Amino acid sequence: MKKTGIVLVLMLIVVSVLSACSSNGNNSKDSSGQAGASTEPSKDVVKLTFWGGVPPEAGPQEIVDNWNKANPNIQVTYVRYVNDDSGNLKLDTALISGQSVDIFANYTKPLLAKRVSSGSALDLSQFTDYGIDDKMGPGAKEWAVDDKYYAMPTKRNIHFVWMNKDALDEAGLPVPTDWTLADVEKYAKALRTDTRWGYAMFPFWRDIVSFDGSLAVQGYVKEDGTSNLGAPIVSEALQRQYDMMHTSQVSPPISLIETTKMNLIAEFLGNKLAMLNAGEWVFRDANNGKDYPRDFKVAFAPLPRITQEQDDFRYLGGLGDALAINAKSEHKEEAWQFLKWYADGGMLPMAKGGRIPASKDADQAKALELLLGDSKDKYDVESLQRILNNDLPTFQVTLPQEVIDIRREEFDKYYIKSQSLADTINNVVKRHNDYMKRK
């Protein structure tokens, strides 16, 4: 009996403890009902990952911080990929392999078209509450793929030649307002010194800036269906570039730039390069006086024509930074909300790095103020405004990325003296024709 009594007592104690624990657990749940909305929001918070090519410190981090503060239920994380061949491969691999990518920036139309064909970019026509054409203007159409928007262009693409104004003044040269590659070489010869190159072009743009403006009008394919990449304007442009590298030697050869990983922006801002064919993205370093101190003023000139008679010349520009939504994203609606906000002014923190919003509803005066910042006295503002206010005819490269790669391969063989100009043109035309036959 004694043993039985002890067992009963122990059982009662256990039941009592369990009951108390259960009661406390229920009370805790009930009492935290209101707090649960704040202490357990993670169940309702949507997390988006935004991939872009701009360094976080150059504006993107401030952008997502501003968004996240105002939108606690939709939190965005920025992932930077370098906008070069390896960086774009990294993004494409992430898209195809199902890594966390909800929104991604495209910097050339051929790369966007490639991502559309792979099923990575969402057709934005399903969203009807935002008129891309109305907001961005007629230039937006250049980013349409098969007459549909798979990405929203968000900034004005502005390409021009950065010039050392002090060096120009010393040489008695005016800031050009309309010039040719022959003029560029003349300027480069006058500005070249033992410690300073005269002129350079970003390797990434070396095969498209010079002559694609004309081919965009003439067409990359002739009426008979064969390649037009052998047009006379192409040969002339290649010859001019080659001569500046190897004959007058006013430009660093492509091989030198790539083998030494020459930082052309640093070369220009360090007074080791007098003229740089680039674009608005250089502002993010030009305004960085800590890492790139300089004691000279910068002026701006339009991109050079190949010849003065080039009546069909178009300027590389239009709109850029086309943001797309991953077709496999689980949060397409939330990503779209972010895109609209970003385009209409959310992206302004990047204006200090040269990215001017394209949307008519973004504050353009604020963008220019941010662009110049505290460095206004370091620029020839008159020449900059001439570039910004010029309503020049522009184009976007529409060649498939594979053909662009073919051209670059063949052009580089010419630039490094491993094949003649005639062989280069013949090879490009043949490979382009072969590509079209495969397609």
PLM segments and residue spans:
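Extracytoplasmic/periplasmic substrate-recognition and gating elements
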Residues: 69, 75-77, 171, 243, ...
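Short, solvent-exposed loop/beta-turn-alpha elements that line the ligand-binding surface or hinge
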Residues: 40, 123-135, 177, 217-237, ...
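Hinge/lid segment of periplasmic solute-binding proteins
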Residues: 107-158, 212, 297-301
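Short, low-complexity disordered leader/linker segments with a strong preference
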Residues: 1-48, 69, 426, 430-439
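Helix-loop-helix "hinge/cap" segment bordering the ligand-binding cleft or interdomain interface
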Residues: 69, 75-76, 144-207, 218-256, ...
